[in-house]
UniProtKB/Swiss-Prot annotation:
Pfam families: Proteasome
SUPFAM superfamilies in alphabetical order: N-terminal nucleophile aminohydrolases (Ntn hydrolases)
Coiled coil: none
Protein's UniProt keywords contain RNA-binding: no
Subunit structure: The 26S proteasome consists of a 20S proteasome core and two 19S regulatory subunits. The 20S proteasome core is composed of 28 subunits that are arranged in four stacked rings, resulting in a barrel-shaped structure. The two end rings are each formed by seven alpha subunits, and the two central rings are each formed by seven beta subunits. The catalytic chamber with the active sites is on the inside of the barrel.
CDD domains: proteasome_beta_type_1
Claim: Nucleus is one of the keywords in the record: yes
Location, primary (coarse class): cytoplasm
Source organism of this protein record: Trypanosoma brucei brucei
Disulfide pattern: none
Biological process terms in GO annotation: proteolysis involved in protein catabolic process
Source lineage: Eukaryota, Discoba, Euglenozoa, Kinetoplastea, Metakinetoplastina
Protein name as catalogued: Proteasome subunit beta type-1
Subcellular location: Cytoplasm; Nucleus
Gene Ontology CC terms, in alphabetical order: cytoplasm; nucleus; proteasome core complex, beta-subunit complex
Amino acid sequence: MIEDFSEHHVGEANTLQHHGYPRKLGNSVLTLPLRQGAKGHPQHWSPYTDNGGTIAAIAGSNYVVLGADTRLNGDFCIHTRSDTSKLFKLTDRIFLASSGMQADRLQLQQMLKYRIQWYQYNNGGKVPSTKAIAKLTSTMLYQRRFFPYYTFNMIVGIDEKGAGVCYSYDPVGSTEPFRYGTCGSASSFVEPLLDCLLTRQHMVTQAPADLTMEEALGMLKNAFTGAAERDIFTGDTVCFHIITADGVGTEMFELRKD
């Protein structure tokens, strides 16, 4: 019986080996093929993400009204409804306004802050002009042109003559001063409205004269209200900064929450 049992299992082992299985399994290692992506759907990774939000500004003869919503998005989620990091105070009369990726936005803000502090340290506490800070921002963005900050920026403030000025940038630092500007997820809704109300370059009727501070603030409130109705990445609250030669005033304006 023992001989029959041994012969039976030896024959079975030979049969398994014949079909490609190893004779000994004690030291064998089980390996699985790597999982492949579905055909036609290659896997991509991006270092950037857009956290949404909209900024807009109108410059007048002696003021600038600057606004940004407080919604911080990620994909189709709302991370917070009280994000005020889109507006960053550089000096008493100059602000950096940014939308886009929050991490890059915060990095750019800190780098500009350190460069301005370094300038003041080397110049006896002298505050750089709005034009100088605008040029510095352009240079810093251009230095990162091969791996740019994923931010959409404006420098706004009061110039040496006491007039409001707004500098708008592309991702690699090209800029020029404008009377008004807007960036962010709802800029395609806000900018045509400001074009229509402020310059009327595409209309026969003459453009209005310089707005008062109250008129500019009301115009931006209407623009953000309309943007929140059309853009899901803009909403909750708008933080307005009214910048003059005497200082900065702040006003909060409620938008829809959904």
